[in-house]
Amino acid sequence: MDAILNYRPEGSEDYYALLGCDELSSVEQILAEFKIRALECHPDKHPENSKAVETFQKLQKAKEILCNAESRARYDHWRRSQMSMPFEQWEALADSVKTSMHWAVRSKKDLMLEGSGQTFTSSVPNKERSEQRETKKGDPDSNPEKMKQKEPKFPEEGISPQNPDSPGLSDLNCGHLRFRWSGDAPSELLRKFRNYEI
C-alpha cells in the first residue's frame, strides 16, 4: 500500500513521450520515431556510454508495447487511468481489479480530422446525381413534375397532416421549418439590434 501511496511517475513510463509521438500515432509513425531514436543512442555507436544500453532497452520495450495492438490498448488504459503504480505492476493485476476501476479512465483524445465520415457524405449526392442522369437518359420526356415525385424519402413519410392521430411535421422539425435565411436587406429593427441600439 505504501508503494502505491508514495509512487511518483517516471519519464521512462510514458512510452509515447519516450518515442516522441502521440497517443493517436499510427504503428508506422511509432516505428519511424523508434528508428530515429534508436540510431541516436544505439549501444554499438556509443560503447563508452553506460546509459546508452539502458536507454536503448527502454526504447525497445516502448516499441514492443506500442506496436502490439493488445498491449497498446492495455497501456493506454493504464495511462489514462493515471493509476499510481508502474505499468508492469498494473499488467500483473487480475482483470477483475482492472475492470472495477473503469470509472477512473479518462477518455481518449479526439481526432483533429475526420477520416471516413467525409467519404460517406460525398457519396450520397453523387448517388442522387446519377439517378437524375439515368432518368434524363431513360425517359426523354421527363418533366419537373416527375422529378418532384422522385424526391428523397424521409422517415416522416408515415406522418400525414390529414391523419389526426399522427403528429404533424411541424412537431418534428418545428425549428428547422420555421427558420429560413432571407436574401433581403435586413430590416431597421435588425440593424438596431446588431448595433446594440435596442
From Swiss-Prot:
Parts forming coiled coils: none
Keyword hit for Chaperone: yes
Basic and acidic residues compositional bias, start-end: 126-156
Expressing tissues: Highest levels of expression are detected in kidney, pineal gland, and raphe nuclei in the brain where it localizes to serotonerigic neurons.
Modified residues (N-acetylmethionine): 1
Keywords in alphabetical order: Acetylation, Chaperone, Cytoplasm, Phosphoprotein
Record-listed Phosphoserine modification sites: 160, 166, 182
Subcellular localization(s) per the UniProt record: Cytoplasm
Phenotype caused by lack of the gene: DNAJC12-deficient mice show hyperphenylalaninemia and central and peripheral serotonin deficiency, with reduced levels and activity of PAH, TPH2, and TPH1 in liver, brain, and pineal gland, respectively.
Positions of the UniProt region annotated as Disordered: 114-177
Residue intervals of the J domain: 14-79
Keyword Cytoplasm: yes
GO cellular component entries: cytoplasm
InterPro entries documented for this protein: DnaJ_domain, J_dom_sf, JDP1-like
Compositional bias segments (type: Polar residues): 116-125
Subunit structure: Interacts with HSPA8. Interacts with TPH1. Interacts with TPH2.
Role noted for this protein: Probable co-chaperone that participates in the proper folding of biopterin-dependent aromatic amino acid hydroxylases, which include phenylalanine-4-hydroxylase (PAH), tyrosine 3-monooxygenase (TH) and peripheral and neuronal tryptophan hydroxylases (TPH1 and TPH2).
Protein name: DnaJ homolog subfamily C member 12
Organism for this UniProt entry: Mus musculus
Gene for this chain: Dnajc12
